[in-house]
């Protein structure tokens, strides 16, 4: 990394200074493969929410470094910021420690999903889509760890995402742009499905595709899971255009809660654990490779 110093001056001298760390690398898609500095890479990725069991969705620098160190221990080389731009410090740390980043815009309308009434097709929401795509690129453009822009998550497809793709490309032609619902009929540079099975992956990868296959979510890490990872990676190593994916997800989203009057024991809780009304989606807060306190689940190995 290099330090870039920028100063502004008026007739009385320097008025303001700022410095950032920058790096130089090239990212492109060529021959159906994602290339970094001219060489194909295998994405051994994880999707990560910003989460701490004691502070909720507030994480410190120490928390971030701990997550990166665990990722390095587990041979994870890429992270998708699901499903929003992360704390700016996260990208600086990914630059320093060497993690590839898929930087995701804060666009999620999960409740609408893919039906005719989804917000991707509602032009009243186009400005909101464009604003969120624009802001993530403006903010994170100078981070070399960011190799792919993501337009959002599970929000259907339509003219609002087509416009977002065009906007991002006009702002930054040096990085690929991906969006999972657009893989068949929309605009996306990466073929980035969710939870494709082995046969679907092999069918696509063996068809001499123009776009690389990198699953944005796969190997759902809930409970006794991830037993099929070897079969996926046998295919990844067999077909050059199949270049990996992002495991859903990195860490359980749960909060530390005392389970004894003395506070000497605890459990990890979420959703309906706090009252009779369950606002969570059953057990879908705890899908991590690691537990909320960062201990490793068996399938982490």
Segments and roles (model prediction):
Residues 105-110, 182-183, 196-198, 219:
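Short, acidic/turn-prone active-site loops that include or flank metal/cofactor-
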Residues 44-46, 79-81, 101-103, 147, ...:
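Hydrophobic faces of well-ordered beta-strands that scaffold small-molecule active sites
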Residues 44-49, 57, 104-139, 270-281:
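Aromatic- and acidic-residue-enriched carbohydrate-binding clefts of CAZyme catalytic domains
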Residues 147-149, 204-301:
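Substrate-binding clefts and catalytic carboxylate motifs of secreted carbohydrate-active enzymes
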Residues 91-102, 114-127, 166, 257-272:
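Aromatic- and acidic-residue-enriched segments that line the glycan-binding/catalytic groove
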Residues 50, 87-88, 155-159, 185-187, ...:
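Flexible loop/turn segments at secondary-structure boundaries
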Residues 96, 120-210:
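Active-site neighborhood of glycoside hydrolase catalytic domains
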Residues 1-101, 131-133, 147-148, 164-170, ...:
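Secreted/periplasmic carbohydrate-active enzymes, especially glycoside hydrolases
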């Amino acid at each position: 990394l290099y330090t870039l110093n920028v100063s502004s001056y008026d007739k009385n001298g320097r008025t303001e200074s700022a410095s950032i760390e920058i790096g130089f690398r090239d990212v492109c898609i060529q021959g159906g493969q994602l290339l970094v500095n001219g060489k194909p890479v295998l994405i051994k990725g994880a999707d990560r929410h910003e989460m701490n069991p004691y502070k909720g969705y507030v994480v410190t620098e120490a928390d971030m470094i701990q997550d990166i160190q665990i990722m390095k221990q587990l041979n994870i080389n890429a992270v998708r910021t699901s499903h929003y731009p992360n704390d700016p410090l996260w990208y600086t740390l990914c630059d320093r420690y060497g993690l590839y980043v898929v930087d995701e815009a804060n666009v999620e309308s999960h409740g609408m999903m893919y039906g005719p009434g989804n917000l991707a097709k509602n032009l009243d929401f186009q400005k909101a889509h464009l604003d969120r795509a624009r802001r993530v690129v403006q903010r994170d453009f100078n981070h070399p760890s960011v190799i792919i822009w993501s337009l959002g998550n599970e929000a259907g497809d339509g003219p609002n995402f087509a416009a977002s793709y065009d906007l991002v490309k006009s702002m930054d032609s040096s990085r690929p742009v991906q969006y999972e619902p657009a893989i068949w009929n929309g605009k996306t540079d990466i073929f980035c499905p969710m939870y494709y099975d082995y046969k679907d992956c092999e069918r696509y990868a063996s068809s001499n595709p123009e776009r690389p296959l990198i699953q944005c979510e796969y190997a759902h890490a809930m409970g006794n899971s991830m037993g099929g990872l070897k079969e996926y990676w046998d295919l990844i190593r067999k077909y050059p255009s199949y270049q990996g994916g992002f495991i859903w997800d990195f860490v359980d989203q749960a909060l530390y809660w005392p389970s004894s009057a003395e506070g000497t024991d605890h459990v990890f809780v979420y959703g309906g654990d706090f009252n009779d009304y369950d606002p969570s989606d059953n057990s879908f807060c705890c899908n991590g490779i690691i537990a909320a306190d960062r201990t490793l689940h068996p399938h982490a190995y």
